[in-house]
UniProtKB/Swiss-Prot annotation:
Residues 112-151 are annotated as: Disordered. Disulfide bonds: none annotated. PANTHER family: HYPOTHETICAL GENE SUPPORTED BY BC079057. InterPro entries: DUF4545. It comes from the Eukaryota. Residues 112-126 have a biased composition (Basic and acidic residues). This is Uncharacterized protein C1orf141.
Length: 400
């Protein structure tokens, strides 16, 4: 039993060796066909271990072909060349600064020679070729594929050359130092593309708008809170309609002294309701010496002045107040005394060389003013600051 098993194993080993030998032959033939049909040959020797085996098999095949040719006299000797060495091509470096990719032109001629030699070869015996007919079909189809690859390479080369020429036409050659010496008056033109300058006034999502006009910014800051829609806390008017009551009272006092007008405290109609307005409609009067005035006459004179005066009149203090102060300072040199007769109910002005009488003060409640000499006399040159006027009124109240 063991002998039979060993015999079967020996038979299997022999069959495996035969199959391996056939596979090596097939691989060898395929590698030979691929080697002869290379489109672009290598410009250097690239030898490996499997190429040495191919070279030995190729030499054996050539020796067999020579023996067959010696038997027949009519057949001529053939030499098979497996290596395609390309011819070196001259490149014009002076004209072109760049070095584009060039494909050798003698590849097509070498391919045609190799295909002609393969066609003229006699048929190899069955031992060298084997029973593979597909290899012959591959060898016939390979030149067509090579032609297609050559056409593609030519089209790529022509496209690269045309692109390089167009770029070379657009870009001008730079001037050398010698050219400038020959033509010193030559005009130099800048061909480089102009840089786009981004404007700083563009509005972006990240950057805010930048205002370069200082006057515009100043007016914007001055008129920022001028037209606000929210009224004040304690008033029913808007900020741009607000009036200064202290300046208004002082102006009325000066006008009454200079122009024989009665003095009355009032506020605009918008800022006070009618109930409070009736309560505060109390007149002020001057007393000179020991003369006394009845309350009824005071009410009559106050009503007459209030009827003649409108509640909505607003005075432009910036224009009139400066002229009034100058006149008032001139009248301070003399004593101004107002007297009121009980019969006519009119004011009369008298001048005397004595001491000046006191100026009446303003308040919301009825005030009794007595004739007392001035302790403090001030010259008003500038009327714009309000703090001086407030301090002046407080000092006059304390003095009285």
């Amino acid at each position: 039993m063991a002998e039979k098993i060993l015999e079967k194993l020996d038979v299997l080993d022999k069959q495996a060796e035969i199959i391996l030998a056939r596979r090596t032959k097939i691989n060898r033939l395929q590698s030979e066909g691929r080697k002869t049909t290379m489109a672009i040959p290598l410009t250097f020797d690239f030898q490996l271990e499997f190429e040495e085996a191919l070279a030995t098999s190729a030499s054996k095949a050539i020796s067999k072909i020579k023996e067959d040719k010696s038997c027949s006299i009519t057949k001529s000797k053939m030499h098979v060349s497996f290596k395609c060495e390309p011819e070196p091509r001259k490149s014009n470096f002076e004209k072109s600064n760049l070095r584009p990719f060039f494909i050798q032109t003698n590849v097509k001629n070498k391919e045609s020679e190799s295909t002609a030699q393969i066609e003229k070869k006699p048929r190899k015996p069955l031992d060298s070729v084997g029973l593979l007919e597909g290899d012959r079909n591959k060898r016939k189809k390979s030149p067509q594929m090579n032609d297609f690859n050559i056409k593609e390479n030519k089209s790529v080369r022509n496209y690269q050359l045309s692109k390089y020429r167009s770029v070379r036409k657009k870009s001008l050659l730079p001037l050398c130092f010698e050219d400038e010496l020959k033509n010193p008056h030559a005009k130099i033109v800048n061909v480089s593309p102009t840089k786009t300058v981004t404007s700083h006034m563009e509005q972006k999502d990240t950057n805010p708008i930048i205002f370069h006009d200082t006057e515009y910014v100043r007016m914007l800051l001055l008129t920022k809170n001028r037209f606000s829609s929210h009224p004040l806390e304690n008033e029913n008017i808007y900020p741009h309609k607000r009036t200064n009551f202290i300046l208004e009272r002082n102006c009325e006092i000066l006008k009454s002294i200079i122009g024989n007008q009665s003095i009355s405290l009032f506020k605009p109609q918008k800022t006070m309701p009618t109930v409070q307005r009736k309560d505060i409609q109390i007149p002020m009067s001057f007393k000179a010496g020991h003369t006394t005035v009845d309350d009824k006459l005071k009410k009559k004179t106050n009503k007459q002045t209030l009827e003649n005066r409108s509640w909505n009149t607003l005075y432009n203090f910036s224009q009139n107040f400066s002229s009034l102060t100058k006149q008032f300072v001139g009248y301070l040199d003399k004593a101004v005394i107002h007297e009121m007769s009980a019969q006519t109910g009119k004011f009369e002005r008298m001048f005397s060389a004595g001491k000046p009488t006191s100026i009446p003060t303003s308040s919301a409640l009825p005030v009794k003013c007595y004739s007392k000499p001035f302790k403090y006399i001030y010259e008003l040159n500038n009327v714009t600051p309000l703090d001086n006027l407030l301090n002046l009124s407080n000092e006059i109240l304390n003095a009285s």
